[in-house]
Amino acid sequence: MRPLNMSDYANFATRRKLYPIVIMLMLALVVVKTGESRLARDQAGRTVSVPDNPLRVVSLAPSITEIVFALGEGDRLKGVTQHCDFPPEAQSLPKIGSYVHLDLERIVALKPDLCIAVRDGNPRNVVTEIEAFGIPVYTVDPRNLDTAVDTILEVGQLLNAITKAQHLANEMRARIERVKVRVAGTGRHPRVFFQLGTAPIVSAGTNTVIHELIVTAGGQNLAEGTASYPLFSMEQVLALQPEVIIITSMTKELDSEQMSAEWRQYEGLPAVRNNRIFIVDADLFDRPTPRIINGLETLAGIIHPESFR
């Protein structure tokens, strides 16, 4: 037998460090393979084998977390992203990174029997890596109000909460129709500039849920066009002469207040002359959950206050 050299010790030490990880991954594979499963087609067009009764669900986006809790199935959640802050109960759950920078090792360590992802946000390569460990990933892709409602129904079906999901869907659709009826008789479509960020100035174009919310609420989206999230200079916005400016900050609330004060310097703007600059909760507009209808109603009340007194 040859004597051990330093490289042997290094290799042995490396293997010792890897053993717990390998064992953990093997256990995870065993967990996700037990129980009955069925095939489901997700909103990315993929056929996914999902468990009949998932008990260890990991949410890969704040909107998914909200939907699961809205369905009354929060106990199934074993991991969420660091941005999952609603409802408050979600904040105490184990974190698996941000929805853009997912921590694969943490996800696997939670031994989920189902992960639910969003197509617009979760990196596809990480989703593929999760699936490589035998963990099913069901992807949703809500891009308008209809598909937001469909997403709630599909998640409800995944979690055996279809009755609650149908109730939420019916309520959402009824509230959408009430808004449409109220704004239909106004005969006006005020020019709306919806500002998502302060540096740079970003708005929401035609192919976004926010555009649909503005139009459904009876407004004209000044950022409509081919780009989903176009950038604007201050001069470009001034030239558009918005009648309503709505600001939602992706960062600090102070940014929104500062931006509002900056707009008010331009007294020639119709929105400034008529005191129609508003700051809104970003989560009501960029998360396709039941709360997005709160955003629609808020928007309609801002654009057509005479119809929502």
Tell where the protein language model's regions lie, with residue ranges:
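His/Asp/Glu-enriched short active-site or ligand-binding loop at hydrolase and phosphoryl-transfer sites
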Residues: T81, T206-Y229, S249, F278
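Bacterial N-terminal signal peptides
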Residues: P20-V30
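A short, structured surface patch at a secondary-structure boundary
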Residues: L55-L110, L114-G121, L222-G225
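A ligand-binding cleft/hinge motif common to bilobed small-molecule-binding domains
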Residues: G121-A132, V244-E262
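Bacterial N-terminal signal peptides that target proteins for export
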Residues: L4-I21
